[in-house]
Structures are given as structure tokens and as C-alpha cells.
């Protein structure tokens, strides 16, 4: 379901101008990243991302993590356009204001459609690896009919410079998480200036060394973006798509410069951007044809979601209970009882144990009860006593 009469470039421009207007209205924020990433984000949402704004908690939705959390207006603008009920135009106007649902960085549980809180660089991509692991584990338990979704990440240069990303990337490659796709907003600009002031890593080679499938594209060419995502959906490895973009895209004054990274465009610069992109609309104003095109994007997965709900309703009752138990994070009362019993034992006996030994004893009373338990230790599990002696984790 899509509106073929509306240019995807213009749909992306709608995202750009909402971001620019919101940051200017707040007099703070990061306009450059949403301006540069709007093209590949538009293709991702309109062509691939399996979500339904009318059912934001649909359990088999795709997950999208904006690891580059400073670019939050990219998500907020699109969420407004595709129809998340909390993301009204007034919320866009109130970007970064107290009591809004549009904080400077996305916050889980505060705003619909936000899968995890991001902001500290590297945190989002690492959390997404955990989400991709969870999808594969749940799929092995409940099958493709119930669990079959992808995890997408929008990551920045800064994300990939952080140490935490190295461990997560290595683990994802080692586990062969083929349903994990990272869209790397490679604009070669940091807030201090050109990226080469601080980093010269060939990210494609780094990811390849960790077992990822990689490709590089023009992050403003919609045909290249669509083809790249379509191809990476077919691989047996986690995927990195290096989207070469221009930060502050569309601004004749600030495109490609660090000046667009973390400061609003002034009115003259916005007027020049409007002339450059042939945008004739006022602040926070989206023309009807673009609104309609984006609303269709928001509706395109309704049928898939309803079909999934029907499949879920037909599975064995015991299996359904286990699935909902896992999804909701429900924990048996037996866990609390067993832990309390162990605490009383320690209190009565005062055993002399290393912390790792008492930790192992706790794990051994909860592992058999919590099927969702994931644990281990990087190459030293026998020393750390994180491997259970009474069953698999």
C-alpha cells in the first residue's frame, strides 16, 4: 500500500523540515543528523519496517533502535507522519520541553514506538544485538508463525567509535544474527569537526572481520537504499549498510559541516534551505499529499498484524501462555521463594563463599525456572562459575 504519485524525496523533505522547525523552536537540539538520514529512514519505513502505529506493542513487529539518539527528531517526525497517536504536531512543537513526549533523546516507556532509551553512544547498537538474540531464541521455541521479525539499527560515526560497540559487533557476527541490519549514517562529521580528527577506522573491514555482510551506498539515493536493504535481508550474517550521507543535507549554508550537528539553523538558513529544496510551506506545515502518503505508510502492515493475531489465537493454549509469559517478562513466584530460602540458609549457616560461588548457587536455583534466562562469560565461565551444573541456559 503506497502512494506512487508522491515523490519519496519529498516525503523525506517533510521529515527534514519538521526536524529543522522543531529544533529551531526549542532553540537547541541536533538538526544535522535527521536532515542527513531522512532519505534512508524514509525508505526503511515506507518499504521494509514491519510495524503498526495503531498497535505499537505488537509482539512480532520489527524493532528499530535509533542508536544515534541525539537525532531523535528523525524518529519523532516520522512517528508523527505515520500516525502514532501520542505524536501530535503539538508534541513536535514542544520538542525538548518539560512534560512533552519528545525529549532530546528517545526514552523507552515515555514515547510510543521507542524500543529502548538511547543517547550514550554505542548503547543502542549493543542493546539491539540483545534484541536480535532474543528474537532467534523465541523463534526456536515458538516457530516462524509466531516469531519472525528483524532488528534494525540506525547508528552514527560516534556509536562505532565507542568500545561497547566492538564487543556487541563481535558477538553478533559470532552468533550469525542474520536478522540484524545496521544502517550506518556515515557522514564523517563529529561535533568537533571532520571525523578524521579522531578516527580513521575502515568500518566495513572491521565488521567484515567480525563476520558481517557489508556494503556501501549513497545514503541519499532511494533506489540504492532500497536495493541494499532488500539484498541484506537475504544474507546469512548480520548486515552493515554504510550509508554515505551529508550531514545537514539540503542546507546551502551548513550541509557537510559540524555547524549543523548540534545547533539550530537560523531563519535565513532555513529560508535558503527552503529555496534549495523547493519547499514552500510554513513552519510545521505538511501539505496534504505528503500527509496522505505518510499515513499510507503507517497503514501498510495492518493486515500483517491482524493475520499474526489470528495465528496466535489458534496455537495450543499452553504454548500461547508460555509465549505471552516470555514476552511480558513474567517471573514465577517460585523464583522469589527459592531465593528467600537460600538467603535464610546463608543467614543460618554463615558459609564462607567467594562471591562467584554464591552467585553460582543463585543461578542454579533460578535457571531451571526461568526459561528465558541467558547467561555465560566471555571465555572464562568455568572460573567465574557462570555455567550451570543443573541444566542449559
Predicted features by range, described:
Residues 1-14:
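Generic start-of-chain signal for non-secretory N-termini
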Residues 361-372, 377-382:
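Accessory "access/gating" subregions that flank catalytic or transport cores
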Residues 36-174, 373, 377-378, 385:
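Cofactor-binding active-site loop characterized by glycine-rich and histidine/acidic residues
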Residues 14-28, 184-187:
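N-terminal capping segment at the start of a domain
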Residues 299-358, 366-369:
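Hard-cation-handling environments
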Residues 51-54, 110, 116-295:
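Glycine-rich ThDP/TPP pyrophosphate-binding loop and its adjacent helix/strand module
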Residues 383-389:
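Conserved small/polar residues in nucleotide/adenosyl-binding loops
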Amino acid at each position: 500500500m503506497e502512494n506512487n504519485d508522491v515523490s519519496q524525496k519529498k516525503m523525506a523533505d517533510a521529515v527534514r523540515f519538521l526536524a529543522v522547525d522543531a529544533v529551531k523552536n526549542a532553540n537547541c537540539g541536533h538538526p544535522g543528523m535527521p536532515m542527513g538520514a531522512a532519505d534512508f529512514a524514509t525508505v526503511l519505513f515506507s518499504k521494509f519496517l514491519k510495524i503498526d502505529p495503531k498497535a505499537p506493542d505488537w509482539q512480532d513487529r520489527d524493532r528499530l533502535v535509533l542508536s544515534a539518539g541525539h537525532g531523535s527528531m528523525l524518529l519523532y517526525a516520522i512517528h508523527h507522519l505515520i500516525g502514532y497517536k501520542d505524536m501530535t504536531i503539538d508534541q513536535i512543537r514542544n520538542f525538548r520541553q518539560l512534560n512533552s513526549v519528545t525529549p532530546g533523546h528517545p526514552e523507552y516507556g515515555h514515547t510510543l514506538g521507542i524500543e529502548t532509551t538511547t543517547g550514550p553512544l554505542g548503547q543502542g547498537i549493543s542493546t539491539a544485538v540483545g534484541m536480535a538474540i532474543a528474537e532467534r531464541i523465541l523463534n526456536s521455541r515458538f516457530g516462524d508463525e509466531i516469531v519472525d521479525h528483524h532488528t534494525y539499527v540506525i547508528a552514527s560515526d560516534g556509536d562505532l567509535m565507542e568500545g561497547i560497540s566492538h564487543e556487541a559487533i563481535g558477538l553478533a557476527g559470532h552468533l550469525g544474527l542474520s536478522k540484524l541490519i545496521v544502517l550506518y549514517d556515515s557522514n564523517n562529521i563529529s561535533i568537533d569537526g571532520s571525523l578524521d580528527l579522531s578516527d580513521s577506522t575502515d568500518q566495513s573491514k572491521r565488521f567484515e572481520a567480525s563476520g558481517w555482510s557489508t556494503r556501501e551506498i549513497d545514503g541519499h539515493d532511494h533506489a540504492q537504499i532500497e536495493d541494499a536493504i532488500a539484498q541484506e535481508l537475504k544474507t546469512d550474517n548480520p548486515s552493515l549498510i554504510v550509508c554515505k550521507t551529508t550531514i545537514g543535507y539540503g542546507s546551502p549554508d551548513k550541509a557537510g559541516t559540524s555547524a549543523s550537528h548540534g545547533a539550530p539553523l537560523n531563519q535565513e538558513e532555513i529560508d535558503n534551505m527552503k529555496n534549495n529544496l523547493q519547499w514552500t510551506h510554513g513552519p510545521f506545515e505538511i501539505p496534504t499529499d505528503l500527509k496522505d502518503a505518510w499515513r499510507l505508510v503507517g497503514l501498510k502492515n495492518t493486515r500483517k498484524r491482524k493475520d499474526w493475531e489470528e495465528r496466535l489465537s489458534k496455537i495450543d493454549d499452553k504454548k500461547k501462555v508460555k509465549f505471552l509469559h516470555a514476552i511480558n517478562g513474567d517471573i514465577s513466584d517460585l523464583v522469589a521463594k527459592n531465593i528467600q530460602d537460600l538467603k535464610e540458609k546463608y543467614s543460618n549457616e554463615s558459609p564462607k563463599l567467594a562471591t562467584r560461588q554464591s552467585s553460582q548457587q543463585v543461578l542454579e536455583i533460578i535457571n531451571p525456572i526461568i526459561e528465558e534466562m541467558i547467561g555465560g562469560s566471555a571465555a572464562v565461565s568455568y572460573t567465574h562459575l557462570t555455567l550451570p551444573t543443573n541444566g542449559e541456559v
